[in-house]
């Protein structure tokens, strides 16, 4: 552990479950790196992701965005190409970008949006994009004919959440440069979405634990009973 990390841990009581407000304040105090650290939530859920009926996945637009400039690749054809360009997509095309990803290992983008009629071609990228969490998916709104709306939401701060194989959801909610209230607003919107996404097959306690941390800082535990207060 580095000197700054050790200093940060002294500000936190590991046994305490903080209120969301206290946790956001501490997350900013413990973000001591000399760059604009990302503030991220880690939510342990009472689900078994090995079962299809206990998957937790979706997307939500954070009111204040994530503080990160998101590069959007749109795979479309026909009239949708100009529509995507006008909406502010960073890259727009079809088979040429699929080949570029396959042959050149090109990944200068953060989100991929595809129209439904392109999914036959995009499917060839499943093994490449899937492990990176970049594969377009209807549940997250990235497979759609309304590419303009999808791009606008992504640029406005839309984030995807998905439970991993350890039953944890990791989602960025802002930057060290954010005010506490903006982090709190983003936190509440995200938590509301995840609570609403609870699978009917999930039994027992749904929110096992909630923690927030900066890129280089320690985790700060949040009282899961008070997440929407």
From Swiss-Prot:
Keywords: Repressor, Ribonucleoprotein, Ribosomal protein, RNA-binding, rRNA-binding, Translation regulation, tRNA-binding. Pfam families: Ribosomal_L1. One of its GO terms (cellular component) is large ribosomal subunit. One of its GO terms (biological process) is translation. One of its GO terms (molecular function) is structural constituent of ribosome. Binds directly to 23S rRNA. The L1 stalk is quite mobile in the ribosome, and is involved in E site tRNA release. Part of the 50S ribosomal subunit. Belongs to the universal ribosomal protein uL1 family. PANTHER family: 54S RIBOSOMAL PROTEIN L1, MITOCHONDRIAL (PTHR36427), LARGE RIBOSOMAL SUBUNIT PROTEIN UL1M (PTHR36427:SF3). This is Large ribosomal subunit protein uL1. It comes from Clostridium kluyveri (strain ATCC 8527 / DSM 555 / NBRC 12016 / NCIMB 10680 / K1). The lineage of its organism: Bacteria, Bacillati, Bacillota, Clostridia, Eubacteriales.
């Amino acid at each position: 552990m580095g000197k700054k990390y050790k200093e940060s841990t002294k500000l936190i009581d590991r046994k305490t479950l903080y209120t969301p407000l206290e946790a956001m304040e501490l997350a900013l105090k413990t973000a001591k790196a000399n760059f604009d650290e990302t503030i991220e939530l880690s939510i342990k859920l009472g689900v078994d992701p090995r079962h299809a009926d206990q998957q937790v996945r979706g997307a939500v637009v954070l009111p204040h965005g994530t503080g990160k400039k998101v590069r959007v690749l749109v795979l479309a054809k026909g009239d949708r190409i100009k529509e995507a360009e006008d909406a502010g997509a960073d890259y727009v095309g079809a088979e040429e970008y699929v080949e570029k990803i396959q042959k050149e290992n090109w990944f200068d983008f953060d989100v991929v949006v595809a129209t439904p009629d392109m999914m036959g071609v995009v499917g060839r990228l499943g093994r490449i994009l899937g492990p990176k969490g970049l594969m377009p998916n209807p549940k997250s709104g990235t497979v759609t004919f309304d590419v303009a709306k999808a791009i606008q939401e992504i640029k406005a701060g839309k984030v995807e959440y998905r439970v991993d194989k350890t039953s944890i959801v990791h989602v960025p909610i802002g930057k060290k440069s954010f005010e506490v209230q903006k982090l709190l607003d983003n936190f509440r919107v995200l938590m509301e979405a995840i609570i609403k996404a609870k699978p009917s097959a999930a039994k027992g306690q749904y929110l096992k634990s909630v923690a927030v941390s900066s890129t280089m800082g320690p985790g700060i535990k949040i009282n899961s009973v008070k997440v929407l207060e």
